[in-house]
Amino acid sequence: MTGAVRRWSESLVRAGASVVIAFEGGGDEGSTSGGIEWLPVRHTGRGWRKRPVQLEHALHGADLLVLHSAWAFHNISAAAAARSVSVPYLLEPRGAYDPHIVRRRKLLKRAWWIAWERELVARAHAMHIFFEEERPHVTALGYRGALVRAPNGIEPPNGVHWDGGSGGYVLWLGRFDPEHKGLDLLLRAVAHIPIAERPHVRLHGPDFRGGKDVVRRLIGTLGLDPWVMIGDAVHGQAKWALLSRASGFVYPSRWEGFGNSVAEAVSIGVPTLVTPYPLGRHLASRGGAIIAEPTADALAAGLQALSAQRAAEVAAAGARVMRAEMSWDAVARSWLAQTEALL
């Protein structure tokens, strides 16, 4: 999310906005980079109780406070500071109000909602969603305020394109949260494919609460060690090189906020298999991705479709969609126009 916030901010500056990013810092002096003012704000508390101190000073002269993520105490504190100086705030939950996430750790979320999150949502000036189909997620919480609709942007490095799949592997990039990301479904899908047709799959990303070990055990249980490799998170040029050489990209999430790695893969023309979450449906509706239900059987069929001749045509269509609709400058201009109309 940090990278996306930076790219959003840089694009908003190019669109004519003045942007200040307040971040956790001690006595450091602020700085300016890429047209963005970086303002360190002292925080207090530990763990989930950490919150900004005297944020009111940083809000002097601000037209709007943008709060990223959800279910976070620092947002509760920051919103209270904004209200105290009559600065409206906009919530950027980035998929965190998806019903699947609301149901996770349900009792804790319910208590948190009653204590803090309900007021945060109710008193928001507006809320940002990626796609219109997310509206029911926030209305289910009782939110009836303004919505700003704009996806994340994506701009691959110059000269980076799909090379036709020279690496010979299907790639997944993400956080090792097996239930959320559907990695158990993906592995069972691979196991369903006849050995002679079974693809080699590479899984790269950071661990999440022991999820990598869960995936390793399932690989062993299913006898998939010759076909599935687990790797570390990759960034920068190494990530783009891995993407460009993949024979296909797969994203089997049971639910998802946006899925930046999907956007990255599609943007350079990699044949991509998605499940029907908002970005996946958006791409598939425009002929830019192969879509499958989040079941092992459906994903197995989708993996086999990645190697079909039509997959390259779908990939090319997806790259055109990304260039036309989801450049950072285009989405920033849309976000800014919608937000300014609400102020």
Predicted ranges, named:
Residues 22-28, 173, 199-215, 232:
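Glycosyltransferase donor-sugar binding loop
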Residues 97, 109-127:
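Membrane-proximal helix-turn-helix segments that form the acceptor-binding/catalytic region
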Residues 128, 161-181, 187-190, 202:
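Conserved donor-binding/catalytic core segment of Leloir-type glycosyltransferases
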Residues 133, 153:
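Carbohydrate-associated surface elements
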Residues 213-234:
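Nucleotide-activated donor-binding/catalytic signature segment of Leloir-type glycosyltransferases, i.e.
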Residues 254:
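Aromatic "clamp/platform" in nucleotide-sugar-dependent glycosyltransferases that forms part
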Residues 271-275:
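Short hydrophobic beta-strand element within catalytic cores of glycosyltransferases
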Residues 289-297, 304-310:
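Conserved acidic donor-binding segment of nucleotide-sugar-dependent glycosyltransferases
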